[in-house]
UniProtKB/Swiss-Prot annotation:
GO terms for molecular function: long-chain fatty acyl-CoA hydrolase activity; palmitoyl-(protein) hydrolase activity. It comes from the Eukaryota. Keywords: Disulfide bond, Glycoprotein, Hydrolase, Signal. Belongs to the palmitoyl-protein thioesterase family. Removes thioester-linked fatty acyl groups such as palmitate (hexadecanoate) from modified cysteine residues in proteins or peptides. InterPro entries: AB_hydrolase_fold, Palm_thioest. It comes from Caenorhabditis elegans. One of its GO terms (cellular component) is lysosome. Disulfide bonds join 37-38, 88-120, 144-151. This is Palmitoyl-protein thioesterase 1.
Amino acid sequence: MRYFPLLLCLLAITTAEFRNATKQVPVVMWHGMGDCCCNPLSMGSVKKLFEEQIPGVYVHSLQLGSSITKDIEHGFYANTNELVYMACIKIKNDPELKNGYNAIGFSQGAQFLRAVAQRCPNPPMKNLVSVGGQHQGVFGAPYCIGDNIMCNGVRRLIDLGAYLPFVQKRVVQAQYWHDPNQVEEYKKRSIFLADINNENNNNPTYKRNLLSLKNLVLVKFNQDHMVVPKDSSWFGFYKDGDIDTILPMNETDLYKEDRIGLKKLHESGRIHFMDVDGDHLQIPRSVLVNDIIKKYFM
């Protein structure tokens, strides 16, 4: 009988370890421009879909700001580096995420989550799914649906000059504006994209942290009118000084010089390319369930 308490302790430890081992990996989501964390017709619906497909899963849909209104506003007007920092703090302070998480980003939320992976390795991001992201930036002002005051304001400011300091520091889309005809200006003035793509100062921690991913899934929309060029969703982009030529990922300097680890990820079979027929973020439920959730989140 003297061993009975010890056996009970061992049983309790084993049970706890089993529960931790079988617990579903939690999910972090980051929405796109003009959206918010909890819109029942967009992110709220996606969150519900994850919860239906993965019983018991914890889903954290990031809200950047003190309110839904602020969250939407920050999709247009903010310093992206500050948003990424805020996201890192939220993720680190969420006890449900302490053992790691899978992530899915929609539109600009995709490259923002990549920045989280590169800058904030604790807790660890396991898989990153990018849905219509702009990883090499855009060279085309965002398409505005209807009379959207914030979106139309962004277009006017970018037309004024994306690399002007007061525009660059305040307009989110300007911070991943990539002008192939002003490459040096882009490298010098871009406060976000040029940094996370290691265009100037080679930050080895960015590469090391991104290489810790198990999978990087890149989803491109074949009729995308929002992401220009749409190949940016696959890390492709215009050739410097030539907007008539689009280079695929493996022909870009970002890949060939392996600045952030793309080449190594690719050669190790951890980058997965998906293309979807449709316009920006028009992903069928069946594709989201069968080709993304069941493959990379379960």
